[in-house]
Swiss-Prot record:
It comes from Coccidioides posadasii (strain RMSCC 757 / Silveira) (Valley fever fungus). Belongs to the peptidase M24B family. GO terms for biological process: proteolysis. InterPro entries: Aminopep_P_N (IPR007865), Creatin/AminoP/Spt16_N (IPR029149), Creatinase/aminopeptidase-like (IPR036005), Pept_M24 (IPR000994), Peptidase_M24B_aminopep-P_CS (IPR001131), X-Pro_dipept-like (IPR052433). Mn(2+) 1 binds at residues 286, 421, 460. This is Probable Xaa-Pro aminopeptidase CPSG_02684.
Length: 487
């Protein structure tokens, strides 16, 4: 994580034996640097507008693969983590809003499990590691909920989903599964300093993995080697999990937006699109770089398209700040793409506005400019970034990574972390489909054929929105620095 390891230091002094001393308070790895679970719980309660009630969440449970005795890879429920900071299975959590008490319930000690896979989390250990008021074993959960409910005329427990109620038989309890999710989504949209540090650290590891790939790409023969080098670097730095499946797409595979086979020979393919990001303490990074296998562009076409996407990204990032509509930046990216593709002769026969309205630019840039990043790589928010407020751009669809769609386009707020990931692609299926549509009159298919071997170019960074601008959290080299890194 970024930031100083020292919270404060005392005055220097001398002990009775004449030895000098100084005291430094270290915050890393101590109670002063815990994940801020209680503040998150308070924020959610405030968002709910409540002064009383009980929030209940359950962690992901231990599971085995279908028809197997092998464990399913564990991935913590993100809403549970947001209110606990706990990355352990089979736990439960309550937050008593009125009393401001956050309680974790952990599994009983299991000797057999301790022998085979190691001991489970104990209450005393949980209190040391996490920002809690209390930690107890699971057998106390039912009793404690009953005690809490007995002191209230109309006790209401707030849960995420109908199927995630605590295992308690009490007819007098009311469960609300409608309000908690949107309240948590609203809170998760804005990241605090601790969360930003986690995303920053995930980006640091991802940057070093991207650099390692660039350093070795000249001698790699297969997409699988790219995948392996990236993963190896992340794991060796403590990031065992990826935020999403690694995309190591060479040549025309780079035109497949979520290509994950990663098993084809590199041969004479012009470019590699590597979309890969490490996860750190459940927080994601999302980074894409597109590069040649040598420290120079293998063709005019590849250099041209990289330059187009680079301009799209730079101008959109420079436009980020609080109060800006992200949708407007998405439309700006399309305008830049159209201007540049017109100059290259790929688009033709219309003005920038005419082509934008036709939707022809979507053939080459078919996805949204970006999304929120946080506990999910496509993180939650109460309103999707890519919602349209007007039906002005009929050719551009409602582009959103997550439902629900809305007719109110949101404005950026300080504390949001968003990706900026424009791309230009030459997808054979997309081009074949375009030939049958009226928008084909704006596309010079003969010129396009020269660009097919480029496949696709995407450049993606994770960017923190601030009150007066932005901070780019992604440090992986791009452009000239990227080419210099290839040896």
């Amino acid at each position: 994580m970024a930031g100083s390891n020292t919270l404060s230091s005392s005055e220097h002094g001398d002990d009775p034996r004449g030895h000098s001393y100084s005291i430094h308070i270290q915050t890393r790895g101590t109670t002063l640097d815990k994940y801020p679970a209680k503040q998150h719980a308070r924020n959610v309660a405030r968002q709910l507008g409540l002064t009383d009630g009980l929030i209940y969440l359950m962690s992901q449970s231990t599971r085995t693969l279908e028809d197997s005795d092998q464990p399913q890879p564990f991935r913590q429920r993100r809403y549970f983590f947001y209110l606990s900071g706990v990355d352990e299975p089979d736990c439960h959590l309550t937050f008593d809003i009125k009393s401001d008490i956050l309680t974790l319930y952990v599994p009983h000690y299991d000797l057999r499990k301790a022998i085979w896979v190691g001991p489970t989390l104990r209450p005393s250990e949980a209190m040391m590691r996490y920002d809690l008021n209390a930690a107890k074993t699971y057998d106390e959960l039912s009793k404690n909920i009953r005690t809490w409910a007995s002191k209230r005329m109309s006790p209401v427990i707030y849960i995420l989903h109908e199927g995630q109620k605590p295992n308690i038989n009490a007819h007098f309890l009311a469960f609300n599964h409608e309000d908690l999710l949107p309240a948590m989504d609203a809170c998760r949209e804005i990241k605090d300093e601790h969360e930003i540090d986690l995303i920053r650290r995930a980006n640091e590891i991802s940057a070093s993995a991207h650099i390692e790939v660039l350093l070795g790409i000249r001698n790699m023969q297969n997409e699988a080697e790219i995948h392996g080098k990236f993963l190896d670097t992340c794991v060796s730095q403590g990031a065992r999990n990826q935020s999403y499946e690694i995309i190591a797409a060479s040549g025309e595979n780079a035109a497949i937006l979520h290509y994950t086979k990663n098993n084809e020979p590199l041969d004479d393919r012009q470019l590699v699109c590597l979309d890969a990001g490490a996860e750190w303490n459940c927080y994601a990074s999302d980074v894409t770089r597109t590069f040649p296998r040598r420290p120079y562009w293998p063709s005019c076409e590849s250099a041209n398209i990289y330059s187009v996407v680079q301009r799209m990204q730079e101008e959109c990032i420079n436009g980020l700040k609080e109060g800006v509509r992200y949708l407007d930046l998405h439309i700006l990216a399309h305008r830049i793409a159209i201007e540049e593709l017109l100059s290259l002769g790929i688009l033709k026969g219309g003005s920038t506005e005419e082509i934008l309205q036709s939707g022809a630019s979507l053939v080459f840039f078919p996805h949204g400019l970006g999304h929120h990043v946080g506990l999910e790589v496509h993180d939650v928010s109460p309103t999707p970034l890519m919602a349209f407020s007007l039906d002005k751009y009929k050719g551009l669809p409602l582009l959103s990574c997550r439902p629900p769609c809305t007719l109110s386009a949101p404005y950026l707020k300080a504390g949001m972390v968003v990706t900026v990931e424009p791309g230009i692609y030459f997808s054979r299926p997309a081009l074949k489909d375009a030939r049958r549509k009226p928008l084909s009159k704006y596309i010079d298919m003969d010129v396009v054929q020269k660009y097919i071997p480029v496949g696709g170019v995407r450049i993606e960074d994770d960017v923190l929105v601030t009150r007066d601008g932005f901070e780019n959290l992604t440090k992986a080299p791009k452009g000239r620095e990227m080419l210099k890194t290839i040896r």
